[in-house]
Each structure stands twice: as structure tokens, then as C-alpha cells.
């Protein structure tokens, strides 16, 4: 996503946030969060898979994207969540952004309620209000994209997530962002293999940035991971956790495709 696209997204997100704040206060969101099941432990679920010697998959529920258009016409979040769980995924990632991804908050709630996996709110966050929103919808983790926020906002988003018992996935796509991410507390670092200016995807980004991460950080490979061989390639750089959406979303049998991606066996 180019800087221009990120700017456009920020503009409509800030409008969305202002409209949401006019409708519901943070106190309202906190009350709604009380009705939700407690956070399921997103980071913990990933660690459990890795401790068992398995790849840990954050499986994405995504209807469409700005670059690819409609990805899955028969879009059924609860059924997809169950298929991912049956296929061995550790966690879910659910798009809640409507203008660019045809996502929705109710997709997150419905997907999470259909299975026992923890769920990430996949969205562009520019205000701690959105973290409270995420928890009120049932999210167990938030995404902080360092290409779109400064250090102070990143820290505020992370602290709010931790206060609510959630985890935070910090997304980076170059060396400068990795250095910034290492100053935050979260041990969960997503490396986006997509160049935000050219849209080109290259797994070498993960291989390169993995050298900067201390052993206590868990690296998540994002974008450009389509096969079990891709997973094995990144494993050589110490990456055994992946966020994968589009390649699985396009499959007729999502559970079988998930299993094959993780194990190499049909």
C-alpha cells in the first residue's frame, strides 16, 4: 500500500472514528466488552503450536482487497472459521475495514463465536478508541501498522490493548520500522513481504529483517506465502508463524488447503 493509499485510508478512518465516537462513548464500548468472553490468548495460541513443533498459522478471513477485488464470492465467516480450525490454524485474522476490504465488525464476532480460536481485528488503527471497539466485538489481538502511525500512537495503541488483556501484532516492512518495533513491548512482530510502494512481494524481506530480531520476539511472515515450501523456506530464517489469507480464501476446500499448507500433506 503506497503512502498515498495509506493517507487516503487514514482520512476515511478518521471520519469513521469521529462518527463512531458520536454514537458510542468509550464507556459504552467497555460495557459491551464485559458481555464478551474474556480474551482467549492470541500470542499464547501461537506459542502452543510452535512448542508442539508445528507451524503456527494466523488464518485470514478476507472477502476482498483493493488490489485483487473480490476474493471469495461465497463469503461465510463462521464456516470459514470452522474450516480453518479443522485445518489446524492457531488463530484467526478478520478484516473489519469496509471501504477497502468489504470487511465488517460482525464478521469478526461471528467468526470468533463459531470456533475456539483467538481472533485479530485486521484494520487500520489511528485511535485508542478503535482498540476498545475491537474488544467490544470480541477481538483478542489488534494490528499496529508502523507505516501508518508514529511511535507515540503505536505505544498508546499497544498499551490500551494490554490494559484490555489483548495482544498486539506490530507490522513492519523495512529496517527502519523493525528498529521502531523493537522499542515497543509486544513480542509479536509481523514482517510484511509486500513493498508498500511497488506492491511487489518478496520473501527475502522476511529473511533480511529476521536477522534484526532478538530471540525473544516471535516473527510472523505476512504476504507472499502460498505453499508449504514457502513456509519451509522461512523456517530457515527462524520464522515458523505466518499470516495467510488470499491463497486459502480462494480454495474450494479451505480446511484441506490449510492442512496441506501447514503439513505439506493433503
UniProtKB/Swiss-Prot annotation:
Q: Which organism is it from?
A: Brucella anthropi (strain ATCC 49188 / DSM 6882 / CCUG 24695 / JCM 21032 / LMG 3331 / NBRC 15819 / NCTC 12168 / Alc 37)
What PROSITE patterns does this protein's entry cite? IGPS
Its annotated pathway reads: Amino-acid biosynthesis; L-tryptophan biosynthesis; L-tryptophan from chorismate: step 4/5
Example of a GO MF term:
phosphoribosylanthranilate isomerase activity
- By its UniProt entry, which Pfam families does this protein fall under? IGPS
The reply to whether Amino-acid biosynthesis figures as a keyword in the UniProt entry is yes
Query: Domain of life here?
Result: Bacteria
Output one GO BP term.
Answer: L-tryptophan biosynthetic process
Which InterPro entries does this entry report, sorted A to Z? Aldolase_TIM (IPR013785), Indole-3-glycerol_P_synth (IPR045186), Indole-3-glycerol_P_synth_dom (IPR013798), Indole-3-GlycerolPSynthase_CS (IPR001468), RibuloseP-bd_barrel (IPR011060)
Q: What is this protein called?
A: Indole-3-glycerol phosphate synthase
Q: Does the keyword Lyase apply?
A: yes
- Organism ancestry: Bacteria, Pseudomonadati, Pseudomonadota, Alphaproteobacteria, Hyphomicrobiales
* EC numbers, comma separated: 4.1.1.48
Amino acid at each position: 500500500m503506497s503512502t498515498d493509499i495509506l493517507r487516503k485510508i487514514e482520512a476515511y478512518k478518521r471520519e469513521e472514528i469521529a462518527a463512531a465516537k458520536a454514537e458510542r462513548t468509550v464507556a459504552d464500548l467497555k460495557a459491551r466488552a464485559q458481555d464478551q468472553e474474556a480474551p482467549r490468548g492470541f500470542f499464547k495460541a501461537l506459542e502452543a503450536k510452535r512448542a508442539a513443533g508445528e507451524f503456527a498459522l494466523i488464518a485470514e478471513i478476507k472477502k476482498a482487497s483493493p488490489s485483487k477485488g473480490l476474493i471469495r464470492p461465497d463469503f461465510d465467516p463462521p464456516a470459514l472459521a470452522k474450516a480453518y480450525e479443522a485445518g489446524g490454524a492457531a488463530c484467526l485474522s478478520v478484516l473489519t475495514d469496509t471501504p477497502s476490504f468489504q470487511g465488517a465488525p460482525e464478521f469478526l464476532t461471528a467468526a470468533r463465536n463459531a470456533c475456539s480460536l483467538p481472533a485479530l481485528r485486521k484494520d487500520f488503527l489511528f485511535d485508542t478508541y478503535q482498540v476498545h471497539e475491537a474488544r467490544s466485538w470480541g477481538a483478542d489481538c489488534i494490528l499496529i501498522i508502523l507505516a501508518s502511525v508514529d511511535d507515540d500512537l503505536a505505544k498508546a495503541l499497544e498499551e490500551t490493548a494490554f490494559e484490555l488483556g489483548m495482544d498486539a501484532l506490530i507490522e513492519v516492512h523495512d529496517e527502519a520500522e523493525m528498529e521502531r518495533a523493537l522499542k515497543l513491548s509486544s513480542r509479536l512482530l509481523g514482517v510484511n513481504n509486500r513493498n508498500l510502494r511497488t506492491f511487489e512481494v518478496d520473501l527475502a524481506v522476511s529473511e533480511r529483517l529476521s536477522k534484526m530480531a532478538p530471540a525473544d520476539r516471535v516473527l510472523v511472515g505476512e504476504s507472499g506465502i502460498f505453499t508449504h515450501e514457502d513456509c519451509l523456506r522461512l523456517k530457515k530464517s527462524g520464522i515458523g508463524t505466518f499470516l495467510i489469507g488470499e491463497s486459502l480464501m480462494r480454495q474450494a476446500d479451505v480446511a484441506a488447503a490449510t492442512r496441506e499448507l501447514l503439513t505439506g500433506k493433503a
